[in-house]
Amino acid sequence: MNKLTILFLILALISVIYAQHKFPSSSEDSSSNDSNSQVTGSQSYSGSQSDSNSGSESHTINTGSSYSGSGSGSSGISGGSGSGSGSGSGSGSGSGSGSGAVSGSQSGSGAVSGSQSGSGAVSGSQSGVQTGSQSGAGSASGAFTGNPSGSQSQEINTGSSYSGSGSGAPTGAATGSGSGSGSSGTVYY
C-alpha cells in the first residue's frame, strides 16, 4: 500500500510539472523574452512658489517697514532722521498713518510702489529657473526663481525707509528722511 501511494504521488508530480511546461498559465509569458520593469524612488518639491511664464514678470517685495508722506497719530517714529537696516533707499510722496502703512508712490532702489497697509509685508521663498533679462535692486530674505522666457524685474526692500513730515504725539509719524544700508538674506537669480 505504501509503495502504491508513493508511486501515485510521483506520477502526480510528474503530471503537474509536464502540464505547467506544456501549457503555461495566462499570467506567464511563454516566449523567451520576458521584460519586467520597476520604477522606484521618491520625488520631493520644496518651496513656496514655482513660476513658469512666457512674458514679463515683476516682483516687488518689502520684508521690512516703509513710512512715507505726512501723518499724525500714534504708532510711528518721532522726530529726527530715520535709518534702517537692509537694502533700499528712495523717496515717497502721499500721506499715511498707522503702523507700517505705505501710501502714494515711491521710486528708487528697493522702494515699494503702490499702496500697502500693515506692519511689514511679504517674505518667503520662490523656486524655479529664470532666463531672459533681469534687473533688480536690494536683497531679499529668500530665493527667487521662475521660468519665464521674457524679462523680469525685482525690487526688494528688506529694511526700513522713513521719509516725509509729521506732527502730533511723540509717537507720531516720522520726520526727516532716511535711507537704509546692509542686506538681509540672499537673492538667487
UniProtKB/Swiss-Prot annotation:
Residues 25-69, 102-142 have a biased composition (Low complexity). Residues 70-101, 165-183 have a biased composition (Gly residues). Residues 1-19 form the signal peptide. The keyword Disulfide bond does not apply. Residues 144-157 have a biased composition (Polar residues). Keywords: Signal. Residues 24-189 are annotated as: Disordered. This is Uncharacterized protein DDB_G0282077. It comes from Dictyostelium discoideum.
